[in-house]
């Protein structure tokens, strides 16, 4: 479920959720997602930024089936919660925003949308961050990390592998099947387990 859900999009999400099979889990990435706890199995997602025992207990008491730990979680905390998911491999979302970069760049309105999936933001180090649009009725955007996180085989948690933005599936197969997964981490490291604790 999207991190940002304007009122105009709630009805559409409600319709989609109402038609899902009972065996489908929903990932609640924001507080509004908890509204479905009485009707569906929920996983607390990255958007809830779960990184302490208080949040885990609160969500568990509410009836959440499982959680995905925050990207800022350190390895020691993750090891204490091996039943939780970690974002293991993928290009993580670094920012969500509702301001439309295409309106700014083109001067066009939503009615004459100039969306292109090739938009990237380039930082001062010449690193390119993809911009992904999420559209229901309205749009919001995600700024995607320029390099994938890879913490594969660093702990015993359940894993979340995000294949969005991978252009070459052979790369992901190499990470998962290679005995050198830890060596690959030097090149494809991310935020997880590099916390500020």
Regions from the PLM with identified roles:
Residues 1-58, 62-197:
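Active-site pocket-lining/capping segments in soluble small-molecule metabolic enzymes
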